[in-house]
Amino acid sequence: CHITQPVPCVALCPAGVDIPGYMALVGEGRCADAVRLIRKDNPFPTACAYICEHPCESRCRRNMLDNSINIRGIKRVAVDMAGYVPAPACPTSTGKRIAIIGGGPSGLSAAYYLQLMGHQTTVFEKRKKLGGMLLYGIPSYRLPRERLQDDINVILETGVEVRLETSVGNEPGQLSLEELRKEYDAIYIAIGAHSDKKIGIEGEDAGGVISAVEFLRAIGDGKYPDLSGKKVCVIGGGNVAMDAARTALRLGAEVHIVYRRSEAELPARVEEVHHAKEEGVEFQNLCNPVEILGDENGRVNGLKCIRMELGEPDESGRRRPVAVPDSEFVLDVDTVIMAIGTSPNPLISGTTKGLDTNRWGCLVVNEEMATTKDKVYAGGDAVTGAATVILAMGAGKTAAVSI
């Protein structure tokens, strides 16, 4: 594949990992060297071996003959066979200090590569553990916690300083961005997109309604609700909706997914939809929620929906769902999980002058990941909105190089 420049699969990898290179190393049985090569562009080889969206496979040259190479699967072979591979030695300190706000995949990626350049990084994370959405958004049946920790441990080996349960904002007890700008040579904001969007229907505040982010975050904290015998409806059709539905299923619930378009328009990856169906999740496609019904105690006891049909394409290119007259029906549920998307938390941007955001509340950056405020960079979901893990990791590496 190296005779083709740029290599198609590498060109489509947001982190720019040398895929043909580590394929060759695994083929030679040099799995530890393969892991080292992956880490040159992606400090989460183990996590990505489990949950990467593998866009590279769609451009694999093998597709010209039959099917793509199972790139993610071979990465899994590399990390499993290699076992523990220590972090490379860091160079002499440059004396520069970088503050990183957010201990998720983007923030930790930036910290790792900055440390390897000789700069001292400090990660400020508001929760009790590092990992961000890798820990609090992806269920353990997809990414075992001990395997995620393997990657984090190697990142920490480079000398990253960590301050857990530390928030940045303007509330009492929080650090301000201006304080950090005075103390550090640069700042990288990687706070993700964890603010839930509202669907805007009656009954949304009833007892038994929870956001998918909140639900999965509780699971990540080790708090497992008893859903035995419960009838759960997940509203939404993305990967987060699939994760929430499959998690609820494992906790004993009967689970339905309600999505307003057809199955062909589901934004979730095909493999995630397949797994959800295989495990027993019921799909109510071409249905739109109209009202969440409640009992005399204010708790959910039904979801009123209306049938939809597809009309003309909208601005996204997908056919617009149109309500079918007189087609309302009630779905018998007692728990509703909202999975209709998230947006960046405005805590930092809303309290810091000179930090521009776009109409979706995402931080505005240039091609070097620099924001509109001097010495402040940003990346990951805080810039793109909710996106993929590998895209966030790639942004962290790009920001590190720019800084």
Mark where each language-model region is.
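Ferredoxin-type iron-sulfur electron-transfer modules in oxidoreductases and energy-metabolism complexes
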Residues: 18-49, 65-91, 219-220
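Feature captures the FAD/FMN-dependent oxidoreductase FAD-binding
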Residues: 92-99, 149-201, 291-304, 309-312, ...
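Glycine-rich dinucleotide-binding loop and its adjacent helix/turn
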Residues: 77-91, 150-164, 196-251, 357-372
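Local cysteine-cluster metal-coordination motifs and their immediate loop/turn environment
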Residues: 1-21, 43-65
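N-terminal Rossmann-like FAD-binding beta1-loop-alpha1 element of flavoenzymes
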Residues: 96-122, 241-249
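FAD-site-proximal beta/loop scaffold in flavoenzymes
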Residues: 205-230, 313-386
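Rossmann-like dinucleotide-binding cores of NAD(P)H-dependent redox enzymes
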Residues: 123, 127-162, 245-291
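A conserved FAD-binding loop/helix module that cradles the flavin
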Residues: 244, 382-403
